[in-house]
Amino acid sequence: MTMNFVTFNQDYSYLAVATSKGFRIFTTDPFAKSYETKDGNIAIIEMLFSTSLVALILSPRRLQITNTKRQSTICELTFPTTVLAVKLNRKRLVIVLEDQIYLYDIQTMKLLYTIETSPNPNALCALSPSSENCYLAYPLPQKAAPSSFNPPAHAPPGNTHVSPTSGEVLIFDTLKLEAINVIEAHRSPLACITLNSDGTLIATASDKGTIIRVFSVPDGHKLYQFRRGSIPSRIFSMSFNTTSTLLCVSSSTETIHLFKLSQPSQLQETSSANTSSTGRRRSLSSLSQSPEREATEEDNGSSDLASRKHNGTLMGMLRRTSQNVGGAFAAKVGGYLPKGVSEMWEPARDFAWIKIPKPNQGQGPNANTGPLRSVVAMSSNTPQVMVVTSDGNFYVFSIDLSKGGEGTLTKQYSVLESNDRLGYSVADY
C-alpha cells in the first residue's frame, strides 16, 4: 500500500490520507483512526471541517462526494482533464485542472463559474476556510502573445495563456464571483500559497524558496517578510495557526521553520497606516485617468480582471497596493534607501525550527531517493507542530513560544500501519 495524498482538514483537527487501497481519516489530538475504507486507488482526498462529507478523486477525471457516516455517494462529476486539486469550505467547492478552475455551490453542487488560468501543473491554489471572507487565490493568468501565424481552420484552438514568469497572485471573491485584487508577491514564479482561517492573510513563496511574504487580504498590503534561508529550496507546505500569530513552513531542506507574526492589535495599526498611504496613491492614480477611461473600467467591473493586459491602469493600481511595507522600521529605512537595498534589512528570521528525523533509506512502500516531502499544521489547543511526511510518518513537536529554538519531538505515528496501535509516544521510551 502506498500513500498518494495527505491533508489536514480546515481546522487541523483531522488528518485524511489517500492510498492505493482506500483512504483513512484520523483525529489529530489525540491521534486515532476514526474511519477507514480499503476500496479503490484514491488519488486525492479533501474533508469539509469535521463533517462526514469527503471529496475523493477516484480516477484522474472523476470526482466523488461521499458521506462517510451514511456510506453513501452524494454526487459524481467528470471533468475534461485530470483533476489536480480539490478545495472545500462551507460555501464553495473548487476543482483545479491544469488550465481551468471550476467553482461550485457546495449546497446545490451547481456550477457557478469557470476560470481560465495559465498552465498550473502544480495546482497552486488556496481557498479560505471562512464563509464570510470566501476568497480564492491562484497565480495571475498570463495571456499568450498574439501570433502572426494563422493556423488552418481544422486545427484545434491553441493555448490562450502561457506559464507565469513572475509571482503575482490573483484574489478572487467566490461569493461575488469576481476578481478583486492582484498582489505582486515575488519576481519569480510562485511555488506555494496559503490563506489563514479567517481569510484575512495570505502567505506566499516563490520557486526560489528563500523569502516568505505575508500580505493582508483582500487589499494586498505587505505586512511581513521572512527569510527561510539563503540557499534556494522547494517549499512544500505553509500553514498559519488558528489565531494567525505563527506561520509554519516546510521545504526540501527537511527543516521546518516557524515565524512569529505580530499581535492582532499591532497588525491592525500597521494595516491602518498602510490603508491611509494606499488611499492617497489611489487618488493620485485616479486623477491621471481620462473620464472615458475611468468610466470604461467602472462599467467593465472586475470580473474580467484576469484577462486584462499587465499595463492596464486598474491592474497597475491594484498592484501598487501590494508594494506597501509593514513595520515602522522598514518605513523609516525605506525613506532613505533605494527599495532594493532597504528590502535587505526587512526579512526576519525564524524564531523556532524543527528538524525532521531521517527516515530509513530505501525502506517502506513510500521510500524514494528524492527529498522527503512534508505537510505541516499547528495544533489549535497546544503549542505543537504536526508534520506528515511522504514516507508515512506523523510527528508531533512541542515548541517553546517564549524562548523559541529547536522543537522537541514528543510523539511519532505511522499513517500506513494496519494495526490498531498506530504509533508511540516518545516519552514512553
Swiss-Prot record:
Keyword entries, A-Z: Autophagy, Endosome, Membrane, Protein transport, Repeat, Transport, Vacuole, WD repeat
Keyword hit for NADP: no
Domain of life: Eukaryota
Pfam families: PROPPIN
Compartments (UniProt record): Preautophagosomal structure membrane; Vacuole membrane; Endosome membrane
Membrane topology field: Peripheral membrane protein
Residue numbers covered by motif L/FRRG motif: 226-230
UniProt region (Disordered), positions on chain: 267-309
Single GO MF annotation: phosphatidylinositol-3-phosphate binding
Ranges: WD repeats: 1-36, 69-114, 139-182, 185-225, 230-269, 309-355, 367-407
A Gene Ontology term for the protein's cellular component: cytosol
A biological process term (GO) from this entry: protein localization to phagophore assembly site
Keyword Transmembrane helix: no
Comment, domains: The N-terminus might form a beta-propeller domain involved in specific binding to phosphatidylinositol 3,5-bisphosphate (PIP2), leading to the association of the protein to the membrane.
Similarity remark: Belongs to the WD repeat PROPPIN family.
Record's subunit section: Component of the PI(3,5)P2 regulatory complex.
Function: The PI(3,5)P2 regulatory complex regulates both the synthesis and turnover of phosphatidylinositol 3,5-bisphosphate (PtdIns(3,5)P2). Necessary for proper vacuole morphology. Plays an important role in osmotically-induced vacuole fragmentation. Required for cytoplasm to vacuole transport (Cvt) vesicle formation, pexophagy and starvation-induced autophagy. Involved in correct ATG9 trafficking to the pre-autophagosomal structure. Might also be involved in premeiotic DNA replication.
Protein name: Autophagy-related protein 18
Organism (species): Emericella nidulans (strain FGSC A4 / ATCC 38163 / CBS 112.46 / NRRL 194 / M139)
Gene from which this protein is expressed: atg18
